Amino acid sequence: MRTRDFAGTPVGAVGLGCMGMSWAYTASERDDDASVALIREALDLGVTFLDTAQPYGDGHNEALIGRALKGRRDEAVLATKTGLVVPEDASWNLVRNGTPEHVKASAEDSLRRLGTDVIDLYYLHRVDPDVPLADSWGAMAELVAEGKVRRLGLSEVSVAQAAEAHAIHPVAAVQSELSLWTRDAAGAPGGMAGVSMGHTGGTGEGPGDVVAWCAENGAVFVPYAPLGRGFLTGTITSADFEDTDFRGVNPRFREDALKANLRIVDVVKAVAERHGATPAQVAIAWTLAQGEHVIPIPGTKKRRYLHENAGAADLDLTGTDLAELDGVPAAVGDRY
């Protein structure tokens, strides 16, 4: 696989988001043994940039990755997160906690579950509006000084927040949702208003061009959900999801919104047909085309999709392709 640079370390141009192996998507398809095998196969393919977080199965996902990396830890760049916790009612509404005490305690818990002595990339999952960013980020910087974390990142932040943190300790990565139906992080309008999990906690303000900020400041940008939570693959045509699948309560997957958003998929399919590729590969390749500093992390639990997603690294979109894709209409419905 082609590689991209993360803080001086080459990683596969396409990473692997591991959340769905433990949380949020189709619980009936979860299989820990199969997921362990898939993670190891990902490493064989050159997919070496792995992403997890404590809330993904309330620690289950981190433990799963720790199991998969036994004997192969040095082959992966491992990212996890702090700052969000699963509430007592185990609902989708994760609770923010950016206190220095929580930041440090959760790092120790993550190290234990992951079975490692150092975290390669430690994100602040969401900024806590009740805790100064400088306090959360300062505690994370102390973990770097202690040798427990190598690099720091932010998730779902604005340009102003990224700059504030960067002035205290270098920001190595910013992770935000970016796909053909969510382009806020690239400075496009829409999609953030009223969300509870966005960069500002639902103020309705846009984040600014975070992708460009990363390029200008030596950070990588990590798009999560580059496949639009599966929608951009062209395989989702109805809003019939399991109770354990959060897409069942996601505004963009309501029947009316879903049908309207199929206009986006039609363009993706047309580009894919020209290249003999799949819609998923085109959607991922579009994120890769946003800059050499961009490393998308599509998630999957299935081998065939792992191989399909990895193949996107070899798909070179033309200027005509990109113009058509950039011209798709904004998605109908809020992100959350």
PLM segments and residue spans:
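Conserved beta-strand positions
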Residues: 16-18, 52, 121-124, 154, ...
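Short, acidic/polar
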Residues: 29-42, 98-114, 158-164
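Active-site mouth loops of central-metabolism enzymes
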Residues: 20-32, 89-102
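Structural motif
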Residues: 41, 45, 113-114, 147, ...
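N-terminal binding-site loop/beta-alpha segment at the start of enzyme catalytic domains
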Residues: 1-76
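Alpha-helix-loop-beta-strand connector modules within alpha/beta enzyme cores
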Residues: 66-80, 138, 142, 146
